[in-house]
């Protein structure tokens, strides 16, 4: 019986410490804890409050959204630049055909002229759709920005009350404003408009 108890105690001592997330080891500390607290597993980092963790997660999510937006804007810009280049090439070819007197044009040249007009028209329509999509995306981003600003404002108010010490509250007469949101220097719509004008390409 004593041998069995000794073996059981030895096996318990050799059990590896439990792991939690990125923390290498989570030790069990039962000294000074009540019965209801013995089953609680916590990370080693206990200096952050739940509100602070939630707020930082919201900021990380916000940064992720900004990066996704920037990628979308760059794609819009690349598509717009390519469309403008294609339209310019077709327009140059069309101008060369138009310069030929009508009586001297062959049947093949007249057919090519009609084809170029149709292609240019389709590309201009495609670019108009691209600008419309960029405008819809801009409005959606504005709505997301408003929702995120409201969320951060609600979360920052109780956090300031909890974390602010009495000494600092007496010294500060004005509350510190919430951290500014990351912004993109210029929206994709504005950059698209800079290339060829508003919704109609100026090369036309």
Swiss-Prot record:
Residues 162-187 are annotated as: Disordered. It comes from the Eukaryota. Residues 3-150 form the bMERB domain. One of its GO terms (cellular component) is microtubule cytoskeleton. Pfam families: bMERB_dom. GO terms for biological process: negative regulation of microtubule depolymerization. InterPro entries: bMERB_dom, C16orf45-like. PROSITE patterns: BMERB. This is bMERB domain-containing protein 1. It comes from Pongo abelii.
């Amino acid at each position: 019986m004593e041998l069995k108890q000794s073996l059981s105690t030895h096996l318990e001592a050799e059990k590896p410490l439990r792991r939690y997330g990125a923390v290498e080891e989570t030790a069990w500390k039962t000294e000074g804890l009540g019965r209801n607290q013995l089953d609680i597993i916590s990370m080693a980092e206990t200096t952050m409050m739940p509100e602070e963790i939630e707020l930082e997660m919201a900021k990380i999510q916000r940064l992720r959204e900004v990066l996704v937006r920037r990628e979308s804007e760059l794609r819009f810009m690349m598509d717009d630049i390519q469309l403008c280049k294609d339209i310019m090439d077709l327009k140059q070819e069309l101008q060369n055909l138009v310069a030929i007197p009508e009586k001297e044009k062959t049947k093949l040249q007249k057919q090519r002229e009609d084809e170029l007009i149709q292609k240019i028209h389709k590309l201009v329509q495609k670019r108009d759709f691209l600008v419309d999509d960029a405008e819809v995306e801009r409005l959606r981003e504005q709505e997301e920005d408003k929702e995120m600003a409201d969320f951060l404002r609600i979360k920052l108010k109780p956090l300031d009350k909890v974390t602010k010490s009495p000494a600092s509250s007496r010294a500060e007469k004005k509350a510190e404003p919430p951290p500014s949101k990351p912004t993109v220097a210029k929206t994709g719509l504005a950059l698209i408009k800079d290339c060829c004008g508003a919704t109609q390409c100026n090369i036309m």
